[in-house]
């Protein structure tokens, strides 16, 4: 008979936040509630699931975007959850990661409200046209209430913020004000259709907000239900296409090229090509690794809406488009900090240079 219709919804979702808003705690809570991890770590105990880089663990901040995989509604929705760097000085990687997202979850600390860094992230999401959900965290601590925070969001970031934790009548009234199509249905006295709400979110007319406390696991289930209910997969091209968004190294020093598939299918051992006209590269995709935290499984093929780390591609650069996918433009966020390297006494300069080259490869400015 005909091939079975693949009804799995595959999404790449990135979590972005101001540095102390509880982003890693939310990621942990999400993975815990989705069943990916059995116990909760805490950033302050330095065993958080997504922060696998030793440099990060020592400093308690997230530098390299990590990812975790989980499923919702009985496997019908598969999510690659990318933790984007929260420090603006790691902005080129954050920007490239945002460029491969289907949806973003922006985490805001309720007591702190909208920070100037929140506005920077919002501008980045707007420029990349990423539909965005908000999780307003730390609502268990003293601070402004929901209405005051929604007012602040609208004042500082613009229209479209709707409390999805409100009762349906209040939510629908707020939704109608954000989108003409929803307004027409609302004025006609019709219940708002899920599909129309999904479309309004995809068009960035509506930004659903949930309020809660990641640490207390409050509001996390509602966010996950929202990710399953109010999303749709990106249209996928028929021919193979993928976007490289970062390059890193595994523990053994093997080069990993991270890409998001946008069309067709990527099969293990496929030959990929890229680089500028006339000076291009061609290489075999040795392994297709699906990472969740520090662990990975090997895939035979990777489909649109999935992210994988490929070994064997020595020359692929972050931002590069493969197959039918075109290259991303240059990152627009200028790094805020410049760095000077001071080597401790007795350091072998050659080893240090090799390590600096590795960092330069991973962050091609």
Question: Each predicted region: which residue ranges?
Answer:
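Flexible glycine-/small-residue-rich
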Residues: 15-17, 67, 72, 83, ...
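Short, exposed interaction patches on small structured surface elements
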Residues: 160-167, 171-176, 323-338, 342
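Active-site phosphate-binding and catalytic loops of NTP-dependent enzymes
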Residues: 5-6, 36-45, 50-65, 90, ...
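Residue-level signature of catalytic and energy-coupling elements of molecular machines
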Residues: 20, 26, 60, 81-83, ...
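P-loop NTPase switch module centered on the Walker A-proximal segment
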Residues: 3-108, 114, 129, 155-157, ...
């Amino acid at each position: 008979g005909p091939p079975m219709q693949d009804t799995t919804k595959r999404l790449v979702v990135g979590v972005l936040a101001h540095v102390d808003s509880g982003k890693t705690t939310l990621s942990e809570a999400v993975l815990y509630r989705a069943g990916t991890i059995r116990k909760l770590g805490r950033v302050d105990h330095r065993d958080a699931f997504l922060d696998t880089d030793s440099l990060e663990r020592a400093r308690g901040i997230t530098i390299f975007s990590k990812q975790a995989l989980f499923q919702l509604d009985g496997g019908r929705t598969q999510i690659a959850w990318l933790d984007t760097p929260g420090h603006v000085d790691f902005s080129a990687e954050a920007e490239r990661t945002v460029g491969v997202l289907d949806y973003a979850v922006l985490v805001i600390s309720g007591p702190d409200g909208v920070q100037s860094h929140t506005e920077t992230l919002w501008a980045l999401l707007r420029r990349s046209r990423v539909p965005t959900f908000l999780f307003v965290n730390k609502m268990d601590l003293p601070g402004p209430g929901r209405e005051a925070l929604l007012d602040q969001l609208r004042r500082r970031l613009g229209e479209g913020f709707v409390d999805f934790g409100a009762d349906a009548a209040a939510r629908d009234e707020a939704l109608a004000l954000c989108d003409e199509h929803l307004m027409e249905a609302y004025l006609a006295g019709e219940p708002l259709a899920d599909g129309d709400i999904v479309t309004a979110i995809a068009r960035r007319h509506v930004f659903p907000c949930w309020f809660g406390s990641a640490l207390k696991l409050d509001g996390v289930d509602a966010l996950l239900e929202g990710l399953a209910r109010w999303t749709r997969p990106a249209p996928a091209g028929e021919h193979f296409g993928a976007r490289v968004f970062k390059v890193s190294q595994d523990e053994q020093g093997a080069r990993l090229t991270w890409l998001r598939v946008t069309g067709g299918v990527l099969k293990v051992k496929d030959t990929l090509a890229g680089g500028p006209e006339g000076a291009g590269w061609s290489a075999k995709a040795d392994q297709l690794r699906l990472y969740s935290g520090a662990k990975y499984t090997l895939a035979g093929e990777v489909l649109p809406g999935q992210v994988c780390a490929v070994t064997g591609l020595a020359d692929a650069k972050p931002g590069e488009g493969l197959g039918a996918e075109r290259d991303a433009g240059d990152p627009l966020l200028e790094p805020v900090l410049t760095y000077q390297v001071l080597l401790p006494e007795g350091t072998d300069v050659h080893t240090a240079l090799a390590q600096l080259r590795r960092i330069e490869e991973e962050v091609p400015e």
